[in-house]
């Protein structure tokens, strides 16, 4: 199965992420042969790169939209994992 370019309209981020999670689960169980593990790992790398590219493109789009606002200033994204509670 080929990974479509994350810039194309046919890329489904959620489906790619779900597939990646499934790959990780199968590999963590340790029941795969070495060859199958390598194939799964390679697919995981492809999915990870495509998802990262899609996220970067989304971030750029958000920054562009924010920049088009009346006060046109850049706002940093807050990482919920590092938020003070």
Swiss-Prot record:
Disulfide topology: none
EC number: 3.1.11.6
Annotated GO CC locations: cytosol; exodeoxyribonuclease VII complex
Assembly description: Heterooligomer composed of large and small subunits.
Family listed: Belongs to the XseB family.
Database matches in NCBIfam families: PRK00977.1-4 (NF002140), xseB (TIGR01280)
Descriptive protein name: Exodeoxyribonuclease 7 small subunit
